[in-house]
Amino acid sequence: MRSKAIAALGILSLFASIVPAFGQTKIGVITSLTGSLAAFGEAHKNGYAIALDEINAKGGVLGKKIELDFYDDQSKPDQAVQGVSKLIDQDQVPVLLGSYSSESTKAIVPAVSQRETPLIIPTATADNVMDSKSPWIFRVCAGANDYAKETIAFLKANGAPRKMAIVYENTNFGQSNMKAMTAAAKEAGIELVAVESYEAKSPDYKAVLQRVKQANPDVIYFCSYLLDATTLMRQSREVDLNPKYYTSSGTGFAAAEFPTEKGAGKNAEYTFSVSQWLPEAKWAGSKEFDAEYFKRFKSHPAYHAIQAYAALRVAAQAINNAKSLDPAKIRDAIKNINMSSTPFGPIKFDNGQNQHPVLITQVQKGQYRVVFPADAAETKPIIPAPVWSKR
């Protein structure tokens, strides 16, 4: 009798592990809701909310509504790893979305792969988050190499500067973008006259910026999150640093708050950034997403929000295509997914990487405007950036 009871309990346990709570299907989300990256985590949460309502309004997945199971990584990689254990081991989610930063995402890749659960990455651009070649890992956003190559293509088409400085935070995110741009600049024949790292969230970068000023670059390429992007531009003005081009690997320089008084304000003018989306992008539903976001949250979204939206759309489509909550079947469905039209553009994965185009934007009169490539441009770039004394 005891063996039969144990067997019965085992079957019930297995059944509970693959069947969600009645009437709903849980999808796990790790993002940064507190800590230094909370502004980006909030953008994630907002993007997920719009996708969630759209999907559930159309019947959810497999006839059941989706519920998002959030875990706050507190902007810390070790907390993100704990989130994997909580969401997969305890909550038994069949697919995971996250995290925000490259640091936290790189930390969770081995843990998710070991648990044989699909991970859909919305925003982490460091290319080494994909180094494992794990069949369980998929990235919606473009990576650091794509950012560097498109920035170089833009520079070649707009004045072809010969000297560059790279200023990057000393983290996985910053190092990955620095290495990508170093290689791209070398290939393009652009001289690197300064490569300066800094510790994130410091109050004073003037010593770094003074060294860059002495090197006299035509263009600066920043790799920074929002707080540092704001400080770097304010202190660039204070030390009277005047390159012809202020460029960046996005992130802080592409945040919705950056050109506002919550960020760099007027100091953001004329800065260039890579971007993966703007409302003006020529993708079906792009402007409608922007309008819905503004209606709900009283601000216009940066691309981080729509990347989260896209990640959840992929997860839902994959579950429906798989006709199952089995993680392996969902993984195979993601591999074969071909979403030809979304507000984030077409989505199709090649070895886990979505082939997403990169845009170059410039802050003009407090707004991000697409200036490159030519077939997507709204307006012409303003080059050179006016010197600070003439602004």
What are these regions (language model features)?
Residues 3-15, 22-391:
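Extracytosolic ligand-binding ectodomains
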